[in-house]
C-alpha cells in the first residue's frame, strides 16, 4: 500500500464531527520540538509498528498481571547500587506522527509487541519478589475472579502525608504541562535512559496514535500515573489496553494521618527477607502536606471483538466515574519483624491508587485476552536495573481503540484548528455530580482495596443529532482512496493550467491507474497517458505525460473513476482550467513506470497486430486466398501464447522462507501478501477467462462470417457470368447501332448537300424575282405612258371627228338647201 505523508497547512478540509475540536486540540501537544519525523522511524521491520504511548500504557496494565521471576543477585545488586547515585531526571518521550488510516492493525503482532515492550517497561516497575511464586492454574478463572484475587493479594498502604506531597508535586507538573500545552510522556527515574530510548526508537504508530487526542484538549490532559508495581503471580490476568482513559482532577481535603503505631506499616514496607531495601535509606526530605489530588479513570466506549463480545456489549459507554482509593504496596506478604517506618515508601500511595483504579475499571470494559507470559530469561534481564520506590513513571497519554478509527491526520487538523481560531474544547464543562457509592457493610479485613464514597461526576455526552456525521452513503473504500490520493497530492507540485479547447479537443488522453476496490488496493488517480502532437496541450507545452489531473474546471478528479473523468473532460468547452500535480524532480515515480509499461505494452500490441496484418497481406499476395482457421490457431497472438493483461504485478523477488524459521509477524505479513497476490491472480484468471470466452465467440463469429462470405462469392460468380452474357449482347447491339449511325451520318451528309443546293436555288430564284419585278415596273411605266399618249391621240381624233361631223352636217344642210 502507498505510504502517506502528513498533510500540509494548505490541504483540503476533512468532514466535521462533534469531537473535531478535541480531536484537533491535542495535535500540537503530540508534536514536541524534539519529536522525530516519520522518516526517522525504523524501517527495517517487516510488520506494522504501533505507538509508544499505547504500548507503555498497555504494558503498565500487563505488569499488574505479569509474574516477576526471582531477581538475580547481580541484577539486584546493580539496581540497588545504581539508585542512590542516579538523580531524578525527566525524559520527554516523543509521540509518533499520524500515518495512513488504511494500514491494518495486526493483532498478533500487537500482542507480541506488547510483550516485548512490557519487558522493557518492567525495568521501571519491577521489584524483588519472593523466590516461591504460586503456579499458574491449569484453567484460568474468569476475568472478575482473577481481578478480585489480584485485589485481595495486594497490601494496603498507610501514611497519607507523603501521598499529599507526591500529589502536590504531580499537580505542579500538571500545571506546567498545561502552560506549555504539550501532551508529554515524562518518565522520572534513577538510572540511565538507555532502555527508554530503545523503547522510543522502536515505537511507531501508524493508526492508533491518531486516536490519541479524540476526546480532550491539552487543557484536560489524560494519563495514567503509577509507580513501579509489585510482582504478580504467574497466573495473574494480563489485561488489554483497548480503552480510552480519561482523567479529571478534584481536590479533597487531606485525611488525618494514620497513627504511627505501626509495625503494620513497617512490616508491609519491608522486603521479602524482612530487611528494608537499600533504596529506602536515601529518601529525600518531603515538603509539608497539601490537598491531595485524586485520580479517576473513566472508560469511554470500549470496542471489543472475539470473546469479549459475548461478555460485554460492544460500544458500551460508561458515564459514571468511580473514584477508587487503593493502596498497593510491593510486598507480597507482611513480615513479622518491626522497624521504624521510613518516609520514602509512602510516596507511592497516589500512583498505586491510580493503578488499582485502572484495574477496577478494567472489570467493566476490558476483554479477557491474555498476552504471552514473559520468559524467565526476560524477567531476569528486566530485573538488572532496579529502581527505588520513589522512581515515578508519569505517563500522560491516550490509548487507541485499534484499527479503522476513521480519524484524520493529526498535524493538518491542528493547523486548520489554529487557522480557524476555534475556542478550546472543554469536555468537563457540562458535568454533574451524583451520589457516590454507599458505605460497605463489614468489608473483609484481608481485602487490600477500598472504594471511595465521594460523589461521582457524570459528564454530558453529545446528542445523536450532533454526532450524526451523515455518512450512511459514504463508500469506505472510495473515501479511503480519496484520502490516500489527498495525501499523495500534497507531495506533488501543483500548478494551474488553462487551455483553449479547439475542434479537435484538448489533445490529451487519460488513464486511471490503480486496481479495483474489490482487491483492497487504493486508487492512484487520473493521469495524462499521451499528449497528441499538434493538439492544444502540445502547443501549450505545460502538460506532460504522467501528470496527475487534480481538478478540471473546479471539478475534483481525486478518487473518481476513469469514466467519470473522461465524461468531465468531454463536457468541457471553451477555455478549460486544469489543476495539474507533478512529481518533484529527483523523486522516483511508480506511476510513471506503470504508465510507461502500459504505453510500451500497447505499442507492442500494435506492432504485433501490424505484423499479423502484414502476414495476411503476404499470404494474399502469394496464394490469393485467405488464411484458414488452422493458420489462425497456430499463429500466436503474443509470445509464448500468453495474453497481456494490464494489472499490477506484486514483487516476487522474496525468497521462500520456512514457516519454522519465520516469526509470527512475518508469517502474518507474508500471509496477507499471499492473500493479495491470490486476489490479483484470481482477477487475472477471471480476466483471462473472459478474454478467452470473448475470443472464442469472436472466432465463431469469424467462421460464420467466412461461410457467409464464401456463399456470397459463389453468388457473385453467377452474377458475373450473367453480366458477361449481357455484356456480349450489349456489344453486338452497340455494333448495330454503330452501323445505323454511320448510315444516318451518310444520309445526313446527302441531305446536307441537297439543302445547300436548294439554298443556292432559292437564292437564284429570289434574285431572278427581283429582276422580274424591276422589269415589270419598267414595262408598266412604259405602258402607262403609251396609254396616256394613245388617250390624248384619241381625244384629238374625237375632237377631229366631231369637227368633221359638224362640217358634214353643215355640208348636208347646205346641200339640202
Curated annotation (Swiss-Prot):
Its main location: cytoplasm. Seems to act as a scaffold protein in multiple signaling pathways. Modulates excitatory synaptic transmission and dendritic spine morphology. Binds to actin filaments (F-actin) and shows cross-linking activity. Binds along the sides of the F-actin. May play an important role in linking the actin cytoskeleton to the plasma membrane at the synaptic junction. Believed to target protein phosphatase 1/PP1 to dendritic spines, which are rich in F-actin, and regulates its specificity toward ion channels and other substrates, such as AMPA-type and NMDA-type glutamate receptors. It comes from Mus musculus (Mouse). This is Neurabin-2. Residues 410-425 have a biased composition (Acidic residues). Residues 290-301 have a biased composition (Basic and acidic residues). The gene is Ppp1r9b. The modification Phosphoserine is found at residues 15, 17, 94, 100, 116, 192, 205, 438, 658. Residues 332-341, 399-409 have a biased composition (Low complexity). The PP1 binding region is natively unstructured, upon PP1 binding, it acquires structure, blocks a substrate-binding site, and restricts PP1 phosphatase specificity to a subset of substrates. GO terms for biological process: actin cytoskeleton organization; actin filament depolymerization; actin filament organization; calcium-mediated signaling; cell migration; cellular response to epidermal growth factor stimulus; cellular response to estradiol stimulus; cellular response to morphine. Residues 100-371 are annotated as: Interaction with D(2) dopamine receptor. It holds the Pfam family PDZ. Residues 595-616, 665-816 form a coiled coil. The modification Phosphothreonine is found at residues 193, 207. Residues 480-525 are annotated as: Interaction with RGS2.
Amino acid at each position: 500500500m502507498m505510504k502517506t505523508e502528513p498533510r500540509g497547512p494548505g490541504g483540503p478540509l476533512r468532514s466535521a464531527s462533534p469531537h473535531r475540536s478535541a480531536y484537533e486540540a491535542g495535535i500540537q501537544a503530540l508534536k514536541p520540538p524534539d519529536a522525530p519525523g516519520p522518516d526517522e522511524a525504523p524501517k527495517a521491520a517487516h510488520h506494522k509498528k504501533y505507538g509508544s504511548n499505547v504500548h507503555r500504557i498497555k504494558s503498565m496494565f500487563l505488569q499488574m498481571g505479569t509474574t516477576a521471576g526471582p531477581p538475580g543477585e547481580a541484577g539486584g545488586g546493580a539496581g540497588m547500587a545504581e539508585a542512590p547515585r542516579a538523580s531524578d531526571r525527566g525524559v520527554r518521550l516523543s509521540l509518533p506522527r499520524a500515518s495512513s488510516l488504511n494500514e491494518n492493525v495486526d493483532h498478533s503482532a500487537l500482542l507480541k509487541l506488547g510483550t516485548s515492550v512490557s519487558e522493557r517497561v518492567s525495568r521501571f516497575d519491577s521489584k524483588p519478589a519472593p523466590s516461591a511464586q504460586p503456579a499458574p492454574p491449569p484453567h484460568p478463572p474468569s476475568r472478575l475472579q482473577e481481578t478480585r484475587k489480584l485485589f485481595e493479594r495486594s497490601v494496603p498502604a498507610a501514611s497519607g502525608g507523603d501521598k499529599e506531597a507526591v500529589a502536590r508535586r504531580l499537580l505542579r507538573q500538571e500545571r506546567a504541562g498545561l502552560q506549555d500545552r504539550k501532551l508529554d510522556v515524562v518518565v522520572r527515574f534513577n538510572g540511565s535512559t538507555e532502555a527508554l530510548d530503545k523503547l522510543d526508537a522502536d515505537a511507531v504508530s501508524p493508526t492508533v496514535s491518531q486516536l490519541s487526542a479524540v476526546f480532550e484538549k491539552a487543557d484536560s490532559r489524560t494519563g495514567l500515573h503509577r509507580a513501579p508495581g509489585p510482582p504478580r503471580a504467574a497466573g495473574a490476568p494480563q489485561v488489554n489496553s483497548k480503552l480510552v482513559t480519561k482523567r479529571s482532577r478534584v481536590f479533597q481535603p487531606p485525611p488525618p494521618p494514620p497513627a504511627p503505631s505501626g509495625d503494620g506499616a513497617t512490616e508491609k514496607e519491608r522486603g521479602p527477607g524482612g530487611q528494608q531495601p537499600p533504596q529506602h535509606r536515601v529518601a529525600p526530605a518531603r515538603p509539608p502536606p497539601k490537598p491531595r489530588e485524586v485520580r479517576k479513570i473513566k472508560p469511554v466506549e470500549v470496542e471489543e471483538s472475539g470473546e469479549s463480545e459475548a461478555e460485554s456489549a460492544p460500544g458500551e459507554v460508561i458515564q459514571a466515574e468511580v473514584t477508587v482509593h487503593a493502596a498497593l504496596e510491593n510486598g507480597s506478604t507482611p513480615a513479622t519483624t518491626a522497624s521504624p517506618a521510613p518516609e520514602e515508601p509512602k510516596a507511592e500511595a497516589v500512583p498505586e491508587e491510580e493503578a488499582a483504579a485502572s484495574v477496577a475499571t478494567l472489570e467493566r470494559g476490558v476483554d479477557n485476552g491474555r498476552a504471552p507470559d514473559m520468559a524467565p530469561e526476560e524477567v531476569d534481564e528486566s530485573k538488572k536495573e532496579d529502581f527505588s520506590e520513589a522512581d515515578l513513571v508519569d505517563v500522560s497519554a491516550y490509548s487507541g481503540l485499534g484499527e479503522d478509527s476513521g480519524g484524520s491526520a493529526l498535524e493538518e487538523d491542528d493547523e486548520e484548528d489554529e487557522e480557524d481560531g476555534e475556542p478550546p474544547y472543554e469536555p468537563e464543562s457540562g458535568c454533574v455530580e451524583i451520589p457516590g457509592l454507599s458505605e460497605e457493610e463489614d468489608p473483609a479485613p484481608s481485602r487490600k482495596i477500598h472504594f471511595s464514597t465521594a460523589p461521582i461526576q457524570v459528564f454530558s455526552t453529545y446528542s445523536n443529532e450532533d454526532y450524526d456525521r451523515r455518512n450512511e452513503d459514504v463508500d469506505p473504500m472510495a473515501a479511503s482512496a480519496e484520502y490516500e490520493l489527498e495525501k499523495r497530492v500534497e507531495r506533488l507540485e501543483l500548478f494551474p493550467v488553462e487551455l483553449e479547447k479547439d475542434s479537435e479537443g484538448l489533445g490529451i488522453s487519460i488513464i486511471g491507474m490503480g486496481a479495483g476496490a474489490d482487491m483492497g488496493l487504493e486508487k492512484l488517480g487520473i493521469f495524462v497517458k499521451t499528449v497528441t502532437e499538434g493538439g492544444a496541450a502540445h502547443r501549450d507545452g505545460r502538460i506532460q505525460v504522467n501528470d496527475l489531473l487534480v481538478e478540471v474546471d473546479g471539478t475534483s478528479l481525486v478518487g473518481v473513476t476513469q469514466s467519470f473523468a473522461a465524461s468531465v473532460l468531454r463536457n468541457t468547452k471553451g477555455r478549460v482550467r486544469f489543476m495539474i500535480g507533478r512529481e518533484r524532480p529527483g523523486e522516483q515515480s511508480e506511476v510513471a513506470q506503470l504508465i510507461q509499461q502500459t504505453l510500451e505494452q500497447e505499442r507492442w500490441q500494435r506492432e504485433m497486430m501490424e505484423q499479423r496484418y502484414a502476414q495476411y497481406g503476404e499470404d494474399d499476395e502469394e496464394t490469393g486466398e485467405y488464411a484458414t482457421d488452422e493458420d489462425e490457431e497456430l499463429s500466436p497472438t503474443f509470445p509464448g501464447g500468453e495474453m497481456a493483461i494490464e494489472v499490477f504485478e506484486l514483487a516476487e523477488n522474496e525468497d521462500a522462507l520456512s514457516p519454522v524459521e519465520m516469526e509470527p509477524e512475518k508469517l502474518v505479513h507474508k500471509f496477507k501478501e499471499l492473500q493479495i497476490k491470490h486476489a490479483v491472480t484470481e482477477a487475472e484468471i477471471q480476466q483471462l477467462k473472459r478474454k478467452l470466452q470473448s475470443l472464442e465467440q469472436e472466432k465463431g463469429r469469424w467462421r460464420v462470417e467466412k461461410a457467409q462470405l464464401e456463399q456470397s462469392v459463389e453468388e457473385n460468380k453467377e452474377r458475373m457470368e450473367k453480366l458477361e452474357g449481357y455484356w456480349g449482347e450489349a456489344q453486338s447491339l452497340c455494333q448495330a447501332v454503330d452501323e445505323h449511325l454511320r448510315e444516318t451520318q451518310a444520309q445526313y451528309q446527302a441531305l446536307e448537300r441537297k439543302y445547300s443546293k436548294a439554298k443556292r436555288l432559292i437564292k437564284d430564284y429570289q434574285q431572278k424575282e427581283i429582276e422580274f419585278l424591276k422589269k415589270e415596273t419598267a414595262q408598266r411605266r412604259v405602258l402607262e405612258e403609251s396609254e396616256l399618249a394613245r388617250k390624248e391621240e384619241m381625244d384629238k381624233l374625237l375632237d377631229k371627228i366631231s369637227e368633221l361631223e359638224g362640217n358634214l352636217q353643215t355640208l348636208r344642210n347646205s346641200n339640202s338647201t
